[in-house]
């Protein structure tokens, strides 16, 4: 059991939020572009992409018993800063001390074989970037994207993290809060997932368009059964 699994006195939600608010005010002086995670309502994620990210994390036994500790933290506004880059997540999380903890998470890029398989199976099924972002695509693509170990979302062995807190747990609640915060970020911009996993999202759309164009060009010289021949035209008009 880690240090922070012990109960050293109850701290109310209001007290936690007040501590986070004070830290936020202090950080804004040196970080004017700070990006806190703000959860409206009880649901941490509301869109298909955000929910899929969280569901993926919760589906693995490695995380199932630990990640829940981060839910209350992210809801209480403890994730003061969260930024997603290519292959990396940077965050500041308000913990029990006055100084926020620094969390760094590395995400492995999606391997080329899996990406090629996904783009191939997406053939003609995603018609626009808007359709992809909104999560409005065929059910079979949902299964493809969320496949464990072979989908778009990272498996535990592809997630590497470090927190500056003294908690000895492999997955502390500060890291867990950040991982849930990513789900909230994907609600706002699902394309961040493609950047995070270094996937060229335009390939999905371009391949669909290219395949459609190729199909149209192949069929361009084929005579349609609905076309009317010259002799039929004469018969039609009684000539």
Summary of predicted features, one role per range:
Residues 1-239:
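Long, low-complexity, compositionally biased intrinsically disordered regions
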């Amino acid at each position: 059991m880690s240090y922070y699994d012990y109960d050293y006195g109850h701290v109310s939600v209001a007290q936690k939020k007040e501590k986070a608010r004070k830290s936020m005010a202090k950080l804004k002086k040196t970080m004017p572009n700070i990006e806190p995670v703000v959860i409206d309502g009880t649901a941490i994620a509301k869109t298909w992409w955000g929910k899929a990210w969280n569901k993926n994390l919760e589906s693995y036994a490695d995380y199932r018993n630990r990640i829940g500790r981060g839910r209350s933290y992210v809801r209480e506004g403890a994730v003061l800063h969260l930024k997603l880059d290519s292959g990396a997540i940077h965050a500041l999380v308000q913990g029990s001390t006055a100084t926020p903890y620094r969390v760094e998470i590395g995400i492995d890029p999606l391997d080329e074989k899996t990406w090629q398989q996904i783009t191939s199976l997406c053939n003609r099924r995603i018609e626009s970037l808007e359709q992809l972002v909104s999560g409005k695509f065929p059910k079979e693509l949902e299964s493809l994207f969320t496949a464990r170990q072979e989908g778009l979302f990272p498996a535990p062995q592809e997630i590497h993290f470090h927190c500056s807190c003294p908690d000895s747990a492999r997955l502390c609640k500060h890291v867990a809060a950040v991982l849930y915060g990513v789900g909230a970020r994907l609600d706002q911009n699902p394309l961040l997932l493609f950047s995070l996993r270094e996937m060229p999202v335009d390939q999905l759309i371009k391949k669909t368009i290219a395949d459609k164009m190729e199909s149209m060009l192949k069929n361009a010289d084929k005579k349609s059964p609905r076309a009317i021949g010259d002799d039929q035209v004469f018969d039609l008009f009684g000539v």
